[in-house]
Amino acid sequence: MTNGGTDREAPTLDQARRQVGRYGLDVDPQAVLVAVRLISAGARVGRAAEAHFSRFGLSTGRYRLLADLEDCGGEKSPSRLAADLDVSRATVTGLVDGLERDGLVARRASVEDGRGAVVVLTARGAQRLREMAPEHFGRLEEMVGSLSVEERAVFLDLLARVVRGSSALTDE
């Protein structure tokens, strides 16, 4: 993608055709172009999300953890958080450490398993989510505001299919 949010995209379909032809591959250049642009768009949206969440003293990961805790009633084990957020336990530990320092979450012994710990959303963490909600959700709506309701439904379906196909990049 180019800077400044213009509609000009790189690479072009012609460039993808040349690249595929250069290597003598039997792959669809348009499929390659869609994948390359999706990866680029994902990186760009990721950078925008980090800038967005930094307004609230958070990162994307820290926000996702807080929102996940709020959605499940306020507490969850670190291993469950890792599974639900699709990140490693080490990542959860780092996120929780920072959120705990800021008073947004706390660790406590599990009632179900005295040996284990759970991460708990604090009142301060819940307040942070409430305070940021109007701006946060307003900006999310604005981000996809140029899409009609029907286009958003199609986009969600297409996105789910692409995400399922993303294992092609990680499979051995």
Regions found by a protein language model. Give the residues of each.
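Key DNA-contact positions within bacterial/archaeal DNA-binding proteins
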Residues: 90
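Alpha-helical residues within the helix-turn-helix
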Residues: 54, 83, 100-101
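N-terminal leader segment of winged-helix/HTH proteins
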Residues: 1-56
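Short alpha-helical "packing" element that flanks the helix-turn-helix/winged-helix DNA-binding module
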Residues: 62-66
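Charged, amphipathic alpha-helical coiled-coil/dimerization segments
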Residues: 97-157
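Short capping segments at the starts of secondary-structure elements
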Residues: 72-77
